[in-house]
């Protein structure tokens, strides 16, 4: 028994294997970077993602999955520890969760303790991109028995990358390259190759294999054939009413994107959209290689497959928001596909609200391991059996803003999402409040908190205490780097 970040972590062993679970199944844990719900299986009208569509058709597609903080390092640290950002005190791109919770047992550690071989290929914990490619990044050595860090020709081709915002590094700017060469020469192609090699080598023992792809994080680099899938004339910027920004608090807009569309002309923005979609299709192809390998190695029927992104991504919504770091649906919502062999819910979509912190207890239950109490999330194993089953749940997402020329002091934003509502507070309301009714406003165009009806006020009264119970709107006293938020 131990106290972790204010939470009691206690491992209790289940006597039986849960219904629908396998005995010591493998886990193929696939992560992607900065992926919006820009997949055909999620209804994207232009996306070409046949392999992820195949996974969705054979598993459960979660339509309301949410991350805990839409920024790479803290989002990944939260998922892997099963704890919220306020518990691990990670809000920026540099702080390691073990500074706050040195003895926390991560998800792969839990499998390692149960006799699994645990390995990572590519980006599971945080890496700076592209500078960290080929390194260990901000990894957690205790989580893995083996790590593999491929470095492909995309790093050698950096001088060829077009940067639409030359005043910023390609890691942060809208930047892209339609690359020469094959998939296998790119870092993400090499990651797939190495993951397949490990699956072949370890096919006769249980494994937890983390496979982390770097795209579609900027710079958007993929072989040219994927760009060819998306003619510029098929690209469209998202619609927003002309007055959309008038009811949105200043703090709601990310500090790295204060100007709509970075003041870039529409033709350049359409090229950026083309490049983003090209990277999504490129990653889709690499996932297809992994799925094919499971079939070829006879592992598909004894391997749980999880596909997740660290957070969502903006592609010009709300009159020109790009990238992440907001509490709007586009950044807070995360694509999540889960396939447990034999689960009766496979092939269906789940409309219930789940969080990325729910993955830790779900996977340990699905594998028949001990249940770790004191985690922030709750298992959604029952939804894998029946995706439409009732679930009393809500999702919490937060983001920390630095002081800048718009905000006199740092501001914490916290948001709660139910199946119907999104309620957001900035500095506990002192810097703004938002309420969106997804029943009639799925794009979050109308902030009902400014002119609330009696029904809106009742919703706020219900949601506010639920939100504040799980996320503090007070700026943390723990260390954070304002330049790395």
Model feature map: region roles:
Residues 5-6, 84, 473:
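Intrinsically disordered, low-complexity repeat segments enriched in small/polar residues
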Residues 5-16:
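Bacterial N-terminal signal peptides
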Residues 13-14, 389, 472:
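Intrinsic disorder/low-complexity segments in short proteins, especially the signal peptide
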Residues 20-427, 431-433, 442-465, 479-483:
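Formylglycine-dependent sulfatase
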Residues 72, 470-473:
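Functionally engaged cysteine thiol sites
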Residues 292, 472-475:
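Charged/polar positions within long, soluble alpha-helices
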């Amino acid at each position: 028994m131990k106290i972790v970040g204010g939470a009691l972590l206690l491992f209790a062993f289940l006597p039986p294997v849960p219904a629908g679970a396998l005995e010591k199944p493998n886990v193929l844990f696939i992560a992607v970077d900065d992926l919006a719900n820009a997949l055909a299986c999620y209804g994207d009208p232009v996306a070409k993602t046949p392999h992820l569509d195949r996974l969705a058709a054979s598993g459960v597609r979660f339509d309301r999955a949410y991350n805990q903080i839409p920024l790479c390092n803290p989002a990944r640290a939260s998922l892997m520890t099963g704890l919220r950002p306020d518990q691990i005190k990670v809000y920026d791109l540099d702080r390691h969760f073990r500074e706050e919770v040195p003895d926390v047992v991560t998800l792969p550690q839990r499998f390692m303790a149960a006799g699994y071989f645990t390995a990572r290929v590519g980006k599971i914990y945080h890496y700076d991109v592209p500078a960290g490619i080929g390194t260990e990044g901000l990894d957690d050595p205790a989580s893995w028995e083996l790590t593999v860090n491929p470095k492909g020709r995309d790093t050698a081709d950096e001088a060829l990358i077009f940067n639409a915002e030359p005043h910023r590094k390609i890691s942060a700017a809208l930047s892209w390259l339609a690359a020469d060469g094959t998939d296998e020469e790119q870092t993400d192609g090499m990651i797939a190759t190495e993951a397949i090699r490990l699956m072949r080598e370890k096919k006769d023992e249980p494994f937890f294999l983390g496979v982390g792809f770097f795209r579609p994080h900027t710079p958007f680099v993929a072989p040219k054939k994927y760009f060819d899938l998306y003619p510029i004339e098929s690209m469209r910027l998202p619609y927003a009413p002309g007055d959309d920004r008038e009811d949105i608090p200043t703090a709601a807009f990310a500090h790295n994107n204060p100007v709509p569309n970075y003041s870039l002309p529409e033709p350049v923005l359409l090229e950026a959209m083309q490049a983003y979609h090209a990277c999504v299709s490129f990653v889709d192809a690499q996932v297809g290689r992994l799925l094919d390998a499971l079939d070829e190695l006879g592992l598909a029927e004894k391997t749980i497959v999880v596909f997740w992104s660290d957070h969502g991504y903006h592609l010009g919504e709300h009159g020109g928001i790009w990238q992440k770091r907001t509490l709007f649906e586009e950044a807070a919502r995360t694509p999540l596909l889960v396939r447990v062999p034999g689960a009766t819910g496979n092939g269906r979509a789940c409309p219930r609200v789940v969080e990325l912190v729910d993955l830790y207890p779900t996977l340990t239950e699905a594998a028949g391991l001990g249940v770790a109490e004191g985690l922030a999330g709750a298992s959604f194993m029952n939804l894998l059996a029946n995706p439409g089953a009732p679930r009393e749940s809500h999702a919490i997402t937060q983001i920390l803003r630095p002081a800048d020329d718009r905000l006199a002091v740092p501001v914490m934003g916290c948001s709660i999402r139910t199946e119907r509502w999104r309620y957001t507070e900035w500095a506990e309301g002192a810097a703004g409040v938002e309420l969106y009714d997804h029943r009639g406003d799925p794009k979050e165009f109308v902030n009902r908190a400014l002119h609330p009806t009696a029904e809106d006020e009742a919703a706020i009264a219900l949601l506010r205490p639920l939100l504040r119970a799980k996320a503090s709107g007070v700026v943390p006293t723990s260390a954070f780097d304002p330049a790395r938020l």
